[in-house]
Amino acid sequence: DWNDPRIDINNYGKGGVNRWGIAQGPGGFAGINSGYNPGEPANRQSYFYSNTTPANNLQTDPMTGQIMNYAELNFILAEAALIGWISGSAENYYNKGAEASIKLWLPDWPKLGENIVTWLTNADIQWFNSYAIDEKMELIHKQKYYALFCNDLQQWFEYRRTGHPVLPKGPGLRNGGVMPARMTYPIYVQSTNPTNYKQAVQAQGNDVISTQVWWQKP
């Protein structure tokens, strides 16, 4: 868990609940396995506290209604600097993004005298200039994935666009073991607008979840 302050109860929690309102399971902070087989019982470990919990539950937290935050902006700039689209330090933008991601939820962080570089180093997710571009992209997009907490559609978009971060693929994934690339057209679109539907399918490819959109990373 990288000693993440957002799930730190002792220093940043309230009423025995951490800022993200996540309960620790017997194996630590771990959710349901991704892509488990249909019909199998879900192996739930960590879970969100319910809205009956008086402190730090996300069901009634206005922070879950984010559209775009400062952390996401900095990770966009980090990627742009990394691939040479803009000037500036990709490392600096990465650090600023990670810091903004924490401070979004905990404006008073840090309380313990550490800074973002120290925290990233202690968590073993610090920036190394010696890393290959793909390794740096993984660093950026793993932290961006967490910064997009509660914005799951954007997380899905970023994964399809870049292939990062590396996500687990369980046996229940189906679709040939490939992450879904798109949604299919609803039946009502096919039935009420058949001409344009057929034209769209002809231009875009088969109307199945494995057909990649035009901007997607192969």
State where each predicted segment sits:
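C-terminal functional modules
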Residues: 102-106, 110-218
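Residue-level recognition of short, well-ordered coil/turn positions
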Residues: 85-86, 164
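Hydrophobic-face positions in mid-chain alpha helices that act as interaction patches
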Residues: 1-77, 82-83, 90-130, 135-143, ...
